[in-house]
Amino acid sequence: MYKRQFLHYALRLALFAVFSEVPYDLLFQGRVLEFSRQNILFTLLTALLVMRLLDLAAKKRNVFLFIGALLLAVVPYFLHFSYGVYGVLSVLCFFLFQKYRGIDAIAFSALTYGRYLYDGNFTQLYAIAASIPILLYNGKRGAVSLKYFFYIIYPAHLLVLYAIHYILANHLLPF
């Protein structure tokens, strides 16, 4: 990814991460702004930055960039981003093994199973099924017309879920 493309992508992720935080906090914390948990877009932004640092570290053979990538990868743990370090490592499984189709899915499955062994969250094991469409990806860029749809759908679905929760919790239905 070229420097300009990377910067635009990182800025878009950052903008929508901030924009999505209010709907996320409303749904999960019941407040407009609550800093005890952050949405997944912050995790994805961190993963993007880690990938960039790893790329630069490999190209420049710079151990300090590599160490910086490792340190950045644990930031989601301390800032309470959704999925934490596991979220960053999940993205890295597919990034680091992108030339080895199938190995990426095995790495992701092993990581996910390891998380299950660590915290006992059985439902996270269903994430392994996400490997299937990723393995079927043909490597071609999707429709540009849908570019912002996927950014907008995330905060929009959070607002819809919050509205449903609010209506049900406050008994606002006439029946």
Predicted regions and their residues:
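Alpha-helical transmembrane segments and their immediate juxtamembrane cytosolic regions
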Residues: 3-175
